[in-house]
Amino acid sequence: MSVPHGPTPAPVAEPHTQEPGSDKRDGRLSVCTKVCYGIGGVPNQVASSASAFYLQLFLLDVAQIPAAQVSLALFGGKVSGAVADPVAGFFINKSRRTGSGRLMPWALGCMPLIALAYFFLWFLPPFTSLRGLWYTSFYCLFQALATFFQVPYTALTMILTPSPRERDSATAYRMTMEMAGTLMGATVHGLIVSSAHGSQRCEDTVHPRSPAVSPDVARLYCIAAAVVALTYPVCGSLLCLGVKEQPDTSAPASGQGLNFFTGLAITSQHPPYLSLVVSFLFISAAVQVEQSYLVLFCTHASKLQDHVQNLVLIILVSAVLSTPLWEWVLQRFGKKTSAFGICVMVPFSILLAAVPSAPVAYVVAFVSGVSIAVSLLLPWSMLPDVVDDFQLQHRCGPGVETIFYSSYVFFTKLSGAGALGISTLSLEFAGCEAGACQQAEEVVVTLKVLIGAVPTCMILIGLCILLVGPTPKMPRQDTSSQLSLRRRTSYSLA
């Protein structure tokens, strides 16, 4: 589940300007190229999916660092990813073209570094006093490096071919592969570490409040991290072998658009964009809170720890399978009508907090996946309409589409950072004990609030803002065909 990237992602779009619909034969991409391009985005989704569901549980129960330090690690990591977005676009835009292109060296160069950062994020160091600093540093590094990969990788779509149709096809391959990576990440990681958090974990310990960490548990997490990290060199090799960046013959001309901060000042005054961004600040933060606390809730606030892996799998499978359905609903009934699909999870989340039983949990997992799918699909469907509306009212140079997308990602990442940081800090105030088998009643109540009331309130607030906000005007067909096609090149989720 993913996001756009890069304030001014290097040479994109204009180099190959071509009338829509003119699909020259020499602009076609082979199926092999599209598949290899799609595979290149898999590792980031695998890693993001695994960390979204299991990182908090690992930091509290295995690394056994205080909840306040977990809060700092999550907040710092998300903020570093948000800040890295415009920074990456700036440096990539300033870089020179090499023999392998301008974007490919950045994407391929980041991959081994991301793999190392990800592995050490799940490694249990021998010392205990500085573990909080260890995990904060590596999570910040992982998020920043992942962004430095994703910016050039998504921008690469625009200079693979001059054909808009082939660009759309390459983007479809990428998003399909990324959805598969999202599903694979949490599934593989969960299967490897499932025995570490079963109901038998505390049965043999004489100190159930805070059992020692078994070396086997630490080893399982290292194995899971190594498996995920290995996807980076494997997929990176296929990306390098199967995809060739085309020459950008007009990069200087394409770089004369708005810079990020000037463009942000202009776009932030556009009412439909403000409505969309503010509404999905709440909705995306609610989804991240729901994802992050489901595993903790099942482990410490209910007796569902043996069902965690199945519940995570159901959420992801239902999200992937329901995406085509939501695409049809968007076309058939309209985008604002489809937004009501997000609130389907609200009553079920409250039901799970009130009645934490296995049958209820499985139903909630399925419905949550369906709602998460539309919450991820809807903003990327509405943003192009907002961009079209803005371009009809203003005459701006190239780069404005990128500013819309990158600023949206920037703000949603910051909202996720704040939501996860504050919510995890609330566990500290409730008296959460790192590594404890049995948490205090205050912690159990807090987890129920975080899994039920908090996402519910945030989703309802976001939907109200979205539904009462201004609707962008739809351009005429002839005008729409002349608007930039660059907007379809970003996005991926976590």
Swiss-Prot record:
It is a multi-pass membrane protein. Its main location: membrane. One of its GO terms (cellular component) is plasma membrane. Residues 1-12 have a biased composition (Pro residues). It comes from the Eukaryota. One of its GO terms (biological process) is sphingosine-1-phosphate receptor signaling pathway. Changing residue 85 to A: Decreased sphingosine-1-phosphate transport. Pfam families: MFS_2. The keyword Nucleotide-binding does not apply. Residues 1-26, 473-494 are annotated as: Disordered. It catalyses: sphing-4-enine 1-phosphate(in) = sphing-4-enine 1-phosphate(out); sphinganine 1-phosphate(in) = sphinganine 1-phosphate(out); sphinga-4E,14Z-dienine-1-phosphate(in) = sphinga-4E,14Z-dienine-1-phosphate(out). It is found in: Cell membrane. One of its GO terms (molecular function) is symporter activity. Keywords: Cell membrane, Lipid transport, Membrane, Transmembrane, Transmembrane helix, Transport. Lipid transporter that specifically mediates export of sphingosine-1-phosphate in red blood cells and platelets. Sphingosine-1-phosphate is a signaling sphingolipid and its export from red blood cells into in the plasma is required for red blood cell morphology. Sphingosine-1-phosphate export from platelets is required for platelet aggregation and thrombus formation. Mediates the export of different sphingosine-1-phosphate (S1P) species, including S1P(d18:0) (sphinganine 1-phosphate), S1P (d18:1) (sphing-4-enine 1-phosphate) and S1P (d18:2) (sphinga-4E,14Z-dienine-1-phosphate). Belongs to the major facilitator superfamily. This is Sphingosine-1-phosphate transporter MFSD2B. The lineage of its organism: Eukaryota, Metazoa, Chordata, Craniata, Vertebrata.
